[in-house]
Amino acid sequence: MVWPYLVSSVIFGSLFGLMAIGLTLTYITTKVPNFAYGSFVTIGLYTSYSMNRFADFTPYISAPIAFGIGGLSSVAMYLGILRLLARRGSSLVSLMIATLAIDIAFIGIFGIYADYLRYGRNLTDSLSFYSFLDDFSMFGAQGLTYVAPISLALITLGLFMLLTRTKFGVAMRASVENPTLARVLGIDVEKVYVFAWFLAGGFAAMSGSFYTLYSGGGVATGSGLIVEIFAASILGGLSSIYGAAIGGIIIGAGENLLTGGGIVLLGSWVLDYQKGIPLLIMIVTLLVLPRGLASLLK
């Protein structure tokens, strides 16, 4: 009875860790809460869905393609909208509202694409589809139970090596901590920001691609996960990549385990309050650690 909840908690926590890292990358570069971030998760969902239906690819094969599409979409959003608004003097509140508008536009685009697949390509489940069943299994657990945490660990390690062992990583850190001084030193801050936004969109889309093996999806799936993603990033300190990874694990696993335990002990009505669990975890943690988990990592 406990095993399925443990497995799903590992998957859920690892995927939210990936998503939270990406959201943190967008925040530390522009200081704007990106409420459109969940839509990049949906891009990964529909990339895997399309490639599965048309080419019979598993999400493991389509994940790198989803990474590229999500990364390019994220860069387009930054260069085509947010940077232009910022250069015209828009406030942080205006930029935040712009991300909300972009998210609504994305949902509309996904709806148009889903309708095309439904009526033009006869894919009747395009608006809302079940999880894919073509995952491999190992030691009695589905493959994503191993792939998701390994991917999170490798990406976190890769970012650590990039930021601490390479010249470009040092330039990234300088651009984030003091962009004005970085420009004086000759660092191309905009190039750094574009790279960070590419990674952020890529991580979101890749996690969305993996998500199709865990749960079903639809046009607003990514947007519906934004509460958990923000909770994980804030729990991690909002400006710490490593804190975001840990925060994602805590939020994802905590939501799964507490929801599952609540259903067993109290009944199915607990599901109605599932979205409140990540916020509760975040609030309790911040009462103890006001600066989030990042304060423990310094």
Residue ranges and their predicted role:
Residues 1-20, 47, 58-62, 88-93, ...:
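Membrane-interfacial amphipathic/re-entrant helices at transmembrane-helix boundaries
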Residues 2-53, 80-90, 94, 234-241:
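Single transmembrane alpha-helix segments in multi-pass membrane proteins
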Residues 25-45, 89-93, 168-171, 189, ...:
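Short, non-helical or kinked segments that cap or interrupt transmembrane helices
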Residues 84, 93-165, 192, 264-275, ...:
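Transmembrane helix-bundle core of multi-pass membrane transporters
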Residues 138-218, 222, 241-247:
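Helix-loop-helix "hairpin" substructures at the membrane interface of multi-pass membrane proteins
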